[in-house]
Amino acid sequence: MLEYVTEAIVLDKVDLGELDSRVYLFTRDFGKITAKIKSGRKIISKLASHTEPLNLVTVRIVDKNSPQLIDALISKKGIPGKTFFKIAALVRDISPEGQSDRNLWELLISLIGNGAEAGDFIKVLKILGFDPARAKCNNCLKGSPDFFSIKDLIFYCKTCYAG
């Protein structure tokens, strides 16, 4: 059984069963971690408010068979916004599990303090290896694509983008 204490940004939290939750974290030391919160949806759960998306938290995770978040303390609340939620979803879906990335961590920390703008989404794409400046539309091979599909990991131009 391993125990980790580290700073993390809460990317997302989803319901798991009747009372449990699954939380997606991006940590300074271990990169992306998906952990279970036992009884995290109970009305008396002390972890429920600490593990809301976009919070900067100090977490304690125990890894026996699978990671379980057992303690969390808010350091800073993120400034919510549509762009920040898109960035959190991008990091949740694309970044590899268990691989630390200092550049991405530093960018996400700055976004928590200052809020996110549209250009920050492109910065995250670059850090994750999807630089739009070097990409082409997947369908027509036109340079300078306008859209990125998180689901397919593909760039599209305005003409070819289906939504």
Regions found by a protein language model. Give the residues of each.
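Non-catalytic alpha-helical scaffolds and adjoining flexible linkers that form interface surfaces
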Residues: M1-S21, F26-G163
